[in-house]
Amino acid sequence: MEVQPRQIDNYIKSDGSSPFEEWLSSLRDTNAKTRIRLRLKRVAMGNLGDYRSLGQGVFELRIDSGPGYRIYFGQIASLFVILLCGGDKSSQQKDISKAIEYWRDYYERLKNSN
């Protein structure tokens, strides 16, 4: 299987905010931030690493650092990754619900723009 580079974009809410960027900038652990950014660089090169499907078009990247950080994303075809939000193991269920809500909103706006 050939590795395909992916374009990574952030989900932007209708109010202009980016839940993923807000979460990442709120992290105080600079080591974790660095590991997350490095992981996203590997994703952009086509290496998703440790991830799983959560259903309804949403996926979870697992980061082996700190309290078990998670990045939630959606994919369009196999080339575009949309970062929805992030969290850790303690807020996982709430974060998954938000990610599904954000993905539905993103997808609806995408369909309506065409």
Question: At which residue positions do the language-model features occur?
Answer:
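Basic, Lys/Arg-enriched alpha-helical interface segments
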Residues: 1-67, 77-81, 88-114
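Short, surface-exposed beta-strand/loop micro-motifs that present aromatic residues
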Residues: 70-74
